[in-house]
Amino acid sequence: MTAEVTPARIGLLIDHLNEKGGYDENILPSLRLVADDYVACGILERPVEFVVRAVQGLPKGSFRPVRDAFYELVDEDALVIFGPWVSENGVALRRYVEALAQVPIITMAASETMLGEWVFGLPAGSMEEEPIIMATVAALDGCRSVGLAFEDSLIGREYLRTTREACCDAGLTITAEISIPQVESDKRVAMATLAADKPDAIMHVGFGLGIVGMNAALEAIGWMPPRYTTTAFEFAATGPWWREQLAGWIGLDQYDERNQVGQEFLDRFQAEHGHRPEYFFPVYCYDIARLMMTALATARPLTGPAVKEALERIKMLPAASGAPGTRLRFGKFIRHGWVGSEFLVARRVLPDASRSVLHATIEGLVEPPDAPPPSAASMRS
C-alpha cells in the first residue's frame, strides 16, 4: 500500500485585516486555482496546502503578532511564505527571516529596505518608483505645482523623500508639505494649508488610511483640485465606502483590463466560481501563485533553501498584473520581481464613485472609450 503524500505547504502571512476582521475573499480561491492547475498538469507531483495566519499588524495593530505568525508558519512546515503585505511590518520582520535563514518569503510591501537574501518582493507598488510614475502622470495631465500630504509614518516619510525627487524631475513645484496622521482624523486644517497657495493639484503619499476624510475636508473648504495618490488607490477596489473616499482621485494600480494574461485568468476564475473579480488582487494572486508553484515544482530537494534557489531561477514569466508586456523574474541578486516600466498603471475613480477607469501609464495618457480623462483644468472646481 502506497503511503499518503505529504502536501507541499505554503504559508500566507496576512497582516492587514478589514473592519470585520477578515481579508479579501478572492485571495485563496485565486491561489488554489493555480495550485490545482499545476497538480492536474503534472507540474507539481504532490498536493498543495495553504496555511493561513491572519493578524492585525501595523498600522492599526502591532508588529508582535506578525513576528509570531511568521514563526508559526515555519513550525507548520511552510516551504515558502506569501506576506507580510505592509512595509512597516516587513521592514521589522526582515531581521527575523534572515536570522532564521530557512524559509523564503515573498512580500507585496513596497519598501526596498526589507529585501534580503531570504526576502523577495513582488511589491504592490514601490516607494522608489511610485512617486516617479505619479509625478509623471500629473505632469502629463498639465499640472505644474502640487501640494503634498504625507502620512506621518515610516511609509509616509520614505514616500516623502522619493516624491520630492520625483516632482523635481517632472518639473512640478511643491508649494506646501503637510503631515497627516496615519489613521482617520479631521483633515480640514491640513487641506486648508495646502489650499493656501492654490497649487494645480494635491498629492497624498502613505499606506492609505490617512486619505480617509480628505474629500470631505476639501469639499468643506470649497476647493476640489485634481488629486493624486500612490497604490493607496487600490483600497478603492475593496468596496463602495472606499470608492467614496477616493471619488475623483487618480492613483496607481496593478489592474489593466488590456492585459490578456490577466483576462484569461479571470475567464477561468469565472468559469470555476461564477463571478469575475475585475480588480488588482486576484490577478496579482495569479502572479504570486505561479512564482510559488514554479519554485515548488523545480526545487531539488523540496526544502526551504532549495525553494529560495528555485525562485532565483525564474525568468520572464508573463504577468497578469500591469500593462500588457509586464513580466516576472527573480535572480541571484535580484529580489524585485517585476519587469517593465508599466507594471503599475494609473486609474481614476469616477466622480460618482461607481467604478474606476484606466487613466495613464508612465508612458502616456490612456483614453478609455467611454470615459475620456479630464485635463487638469477641467478637474478643478
Predicted features and spans:
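Extracytosolic ligand-binding ectodomains
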Residues: 1-381
